Amino acid sequence: MSEFITVARPYAKAAFDFAVEHQSVERWQDMLAFAAEVTKNEQMAELLSGALAPETLAESFIAVCGEQLDENSQNLIRVMAENGRLNALPDVLEQFIHLRAVSEATAEVDVISAAALSEQQLAKISAAMEKRLSRKVKLNCKIDKSVMAGVIIRAGDMVIDGSVRGRLERLADVLQS
């Protein structure tokens, strides 16, 4: 867990509550995702760790984000800058996504495979995970050649490793013990 998670929670909650009230949850998530990416830029990271006045820092950050932020999200950026918390934006995004998932009774499920999966395979995985987690799932598919064959499924703390690589690693552990 990140060191900013506790700091990020109230900002995420305020942003989420505002987004729900104004029926703009998707838009807010997109704005936060963009702003979080901006904080990862090397030049911006230097500005964030520098000694700029909060007002100057906020306006510089907002200028970089441009049209990606609306007036309300710019206000969030200003408040976070005043409190020296712009570095926490990636964690604010993470907490916002979590609040949205809880609100919508959905779960993010990562599916990692060596090759692209068919729609039928994805439908089976989705149905099985919805049954297991008792909620709707959103599949995030990734291709990783090191998996070799099979799939690795991650949902929160749960990991189902059905990959050949995982089986070989478990076999090696058994043989070494």
Curated annotation (Swiss-Prot):
GO molecular function, one term: proton-transporting ATP synthase activity, rotational mechanism
Localization annotation: Cell inner membrane
Gene (name only): atpH
Entry similarity comment: Belongs to the ATPase delta chain family.
Top-rank taxon, per record: Bacteria
Protein name: ATP synthase subunit delta
InterPro entries found in the cross-reference section: ATP_synth_OSCP/delta_N_sf, ATPase_OSCP/d_CS, ATPase_OSCP/dsu
Pfam families linked to this entry: OSCP
Keyword terms of this UniProt record: ATP synthesis, Cell inner membrane, Cell membrane, CF(1), Hydrogen ion transport, Ion transport, Membrane, Transport
SUPFAM superfamilies (alphabetical): N-terminal domain of the delta subunit of the F1F0-ATP synthase (SSF47928)
